[in-house]
Amino acid sequence: MRWRSPIRGPWLTSMFALPLLVGLPVVAFTGLLDRLAYGREQAIPAADAVGGLQLPWWDWPASPAWLFRLTEGLHVGLGIVLVPLVLAKLWSVIPKLFTAPGRNPVTLLERLSLVLLVGSILFLIVTGLLNVQYDYVFGFSFYDGHYAAAWVFLASFALHVVTKLPTMVRSLRGRSLRTELATPLAATRPEPAHPLVAPDPDPPTMSRRGALALVGGGMLFVAALTVGQFTDRLRSTALLLPRGRTTAPDSTERGGPNDFPVNRTFVASGIAPAAVGSAWTLTLTGGTAPVVLDRAALAALPQHTAELPIACVEGWSTAQVWTGVRLTDLARAAGVTDPETAEVRSAEVGSPFARSLLNRGQTVSPDSLLALRVNGAELSPDHGYPARLIVPALPGVHNTKWVVTIGFSRAAPR
């Protein structure tokens, strides 16, 4: 196969690689933080070790409230924005994938890292984009597959950086960026002889500055389509938002207090309407005997209002004003004055996310609520009526909806 682009070469490859050298570790690090946020105590596939690859665990904090919104927004948002740059970088080195590596150990190591790096990053991009769109066509756990591939990526990325960083530095020093940005198409010439440089190039149809502008413009375009997923005021620009830009059932409720994104709808939960109807009650356990409260009794307890975000693993997030009963007040009502943990269960049956386990910090946070209202209005069924959990910095999927039971454990004597 012949590769005849006259602009392909080590300098252009290095220009594409430089921002990836910073951006990809940020995407990887925030992804690992997001996995920690899920917490192994949740006992769901997202938090289990995969092939022995287990992160060190600590209690995910409940402050600042926007922590998970930041880490998940960076992971998904920056990951999507970097896709055009990743593809450009792969295009720039594709001749290397079709040449024999030889028998030199260093060359073999470099080729191995390149193959693993390309394979893992394409896998992560494809599965990540499918997850953002809720399209699980791959037949395996997204959480496990994405997590395992992330470790392959991290190892191959580190190996690739070690072997190629000196080449990148030399290449960047060998040509002036200012000169290249001032070079028009008519004056574009191939780089000096190199395995990436075509020995018999075609006439240029794009300058190097044009290639940089094309990739940069693509990144800006993708950013414009993505930023609205986690910025409430720009949600109307999020053309790729998988759940649409409004969740109102009709035009009369559009822009209302419950018109913000939802992951799992009430219909999708399969809960019988009677289970969350007028006969609904909340059971509190952990004290000497269970305490049962109906919604009127909950509404009669002291109410607390807080503006808190919900952020989901698919990348979208939103901040809303929630009103409800503090978990600490519910713990006292249950007879537990110093709670250590809380287990919150939903009326939904059979879902791995129908149960949420909260650590001490999450349980005793003054803004951790069993919410009854949002933005001054009753919760809609899709948003968890008659009551839902809302905890600062907790992944959205663990802010359990349609809550029926909360069990508190007592703190050990200090």
Where are the language model's segments positioned?
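Structured, non-membrane catalytic/scaffold regions adjacent to prosthetic-group chemistry
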Residues: 230-236, 242-414
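Membrane-embedded alpha-helical bundles that constitute the cytochrome b-like, heme-associated redox core
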Residues: 1-246, 260, 385
